[in-house]
């Protein structure tokens, strides 16, 4: 087949232009480099309201596959992780985890509880979404709820994911938020916030977890609270 030289030149221009546009739109600026996350270990209180710290609680933590490990800290999935247990005045224990990563692009993404619990041998089911009100007049936090079970351990979980300044729990939502930041040339940071309980019914667990989240957010300064709520 004979190729028209003019068409070949035009096709080359289009291909080169598309490649150049793709490179120009590639996110380059780390949000974490310009908007530092708080030191979670210090800003999250060890005692607040009716809650006090319970040591040596065995939490299921997000895994970090060896394939993702890099020498550069900015390329690690999580650069901060706080895992604690808290008990209220009645002795009810809540397990609390926050994992923060400075790079939340398509290659390095937050590990959902479904993933890390599944890797630990749990069966995860009964997923649902809920709106959590933590302050009058403030937009509610969209959270996900699942139940993890392993042998006799029954663990209802409430969690949410932040990508940049947005709460985005669904796969499509996270893709859209990352695209929004990508069009601005920004690589967003992100965080996983998780609360769970063992030894209570599903309804009792979620009620206790909601109370814990409400009390924790109320104990934080407005600036630190925004890290959790977006």
State what each model feature region is.
Residues 4-23, 30, 130-230:
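A short, solvent-exposed beta-edge/loop patch
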Residues 26-45:
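Alpha-helical transmembrane signal-anchor/signal-peptide segments
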Residues 42-61:
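Amphipathic alpha-helical segments
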Residues 43-44, 78, 185, 208:
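Generic detector of ordered secondary-structure context
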Residues 49, 92, 189-191:
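A generic secondary-structure signal marking the coil-to-beta-strand transition
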Residues 55-181:
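Short, solvent-exposed recognition patches
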């Amino acid at each position: 087949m004979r190729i028209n030289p003019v068409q070949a030149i035009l096709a080359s221009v289009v291909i080169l232009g598309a490649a150049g546009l793709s490179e120009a739109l590639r996110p380059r600026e780390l949000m974490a480099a310009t908007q530092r996350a708080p030191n979670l270990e210090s800003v999250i209180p060890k005692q607040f309201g009716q809650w006090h710290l319970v040591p040596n609680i065995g939490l299921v933590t997000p895994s970090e596959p060896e394939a993702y490990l890099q020498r550069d800290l900015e390329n690690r999935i999580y650069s901060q992780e706080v895992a604690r247990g808290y008990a209220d005045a009645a002795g009810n224990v809540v397990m609390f985890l926050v994992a923060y990563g400075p790079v939340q692009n398509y290659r390095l993404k937050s590990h959902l509880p479904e993933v890390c619990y599944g890797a630990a041998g749990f069966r995860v089911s009964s997923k649902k979404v809920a709106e959590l009100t933590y302050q009058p007049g403030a937009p509610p936090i969209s959270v996900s709820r699942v139940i993890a079970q392993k042998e006799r351990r029954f663990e209802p979980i409430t969690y949410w994911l932040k990508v940049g300044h947005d709460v985005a729990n669904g796969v499509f939502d996270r893709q859209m938020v990352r695209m929004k930041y990508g069009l601005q040339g920004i690589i967003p940071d992100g965080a996983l916030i998780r609360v769970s309980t063992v030894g209570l019914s599903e309804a009792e667990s979620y009620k206790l977890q909601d109370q814990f989240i409400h009390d924790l957010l109320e104990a934080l300064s407005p600036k630190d609270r925004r890290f959790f709520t977006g």
